């Protein structure tokens, strides 16, 4: 698939280098609240909720906090979180790289101000709605972690209705990402699990149609600093961008 998200790959590498926790407890709890609010509060029947819970557990969020977040989303634990909105913001990074941000917020003005500050401090600009979203398509992605036999993955992908897949097989990383249409994500996820493949999680992801090649180390460093700054904001759930960068340059910028 053209334009697999390079930022998703870089985040995996950065996690190995600096061992930072990814999302904050606030970000992960909000994802659970909204998933429970948008669908059934039962993770067995709600893939979005199940994925949010799995990410929260992986980050060490206590079960009591997870249950409370589910109850808030279901409307059985007070009404403080009912004002959370899902909003998409768009902008440009250094070198004209298009950046798409998904946020959950109870205060649009605060979120916009925080995003604008992050962009301006790191050589970018927060844009108007629609300025870059046309450059991306949303896909379902099933993430596998561990040794993957390509023949098994190919058969399961065909049976599960996948569009394509990408295998990672190196000393540092083994696994794969399998891509499909949004409406088929649950089916693909179940099929891969039934075939015994090491499914870690499933998610929706914005995939760029085309990518800008970043070759300048300073530009690359500024861009990754901006992406980190955006990801670190409590209101931000996901960030993606339409750039590509050689692995050698990535190693220099995240070392």
Curated annotation (Swiss-Prot):
GO terms for cellular component: cytosol. The keyword DNA-binding applies. It is found in: Cytoplasm. Transmembrane segments: none annotated. Keywords: Cytoplasm, DNA-binding, Transcription, Transcription regulation. One of its GO terms (biological process) is regulation of DNA-templated transcription. Disulfide bonds: none annotated. InterPro entries: Integrase-like_N, TACO1_YebC-like_2nd/3rd_dom, TACO1_YebC_N, Transcrip_reg_TACO1-like, Transcrip_reg_TACO1-like_dom3, YebC-like. Its main location: cytoplasm. It comes from the Bacteria. GO terms for molecular function: DNA binding. Belongs to the TACO1 family. PANTHER family: TRANSCRIPTIONAL REGULATORY PROTEIN YEBC-RELATED, TRANSLATIONAL ACTIVATOR OF CYTOCHROME C OXIDASE 1. HAMAP family: Transcrip_reg_TACO1 (MF_00693). This is Probable transcriptional regulatory protein PCC7424_2775. It comes from Gloeothece citriformis (strain PCC 7424) (Cyanothece sp. (strain PCC 7424)).
């Amino acid at each position: 698939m053209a334009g697999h998200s390079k930022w998703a790959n870089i985040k995996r590498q950065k996690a190995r280098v600096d061992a930072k926790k990814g999302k904050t407890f606030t970000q992960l709890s909000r994802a659970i609240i909204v998933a429970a609010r948008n669908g059934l509060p039962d993770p067995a029947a709600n893939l979005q909720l199940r994925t949010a819970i799995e990410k929260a557990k992986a980050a060490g969020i206590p079960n009591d906090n997870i249950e409370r977040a589910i109850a808030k989303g279901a409307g059985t634990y007070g009404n403080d979180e009912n004002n959370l909105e899902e909003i998409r913001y768009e902008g440009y990074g250094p070198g004209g790289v298009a950046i798409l941000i998904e946020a959950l917020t109870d205060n649009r003005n605060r979120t916009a101000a925080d995003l604008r500050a992050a962009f301006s401090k790191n050589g970018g600009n927060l844009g108007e709605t629609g300025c870059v979203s046309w450059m991306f398509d949303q896909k379902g992605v099933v993430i596998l972690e561990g040794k993957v036999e390509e023949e098994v993955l190919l058969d399961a992908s065909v049976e599960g209705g996948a569009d394509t897949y990408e295998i990672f097989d190196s000393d540092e990383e083994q696994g794969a990402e399998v891509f499909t249409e949004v409406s088929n994500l649950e089916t693909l996820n179940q099929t891969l699990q039934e075939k015994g493949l090491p499914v870690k999680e499933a998610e929706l992801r914005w995939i760029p149609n085309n990518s800008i090649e970043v070759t300048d180390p300073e530009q690359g460093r500024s861009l990754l600093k901006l992406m980190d700054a955006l990801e670190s904001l409590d209101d931000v759930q996901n960030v993606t961008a339409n750039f590509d960068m050689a692995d050698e340059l990535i190693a220099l910028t995240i070392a």
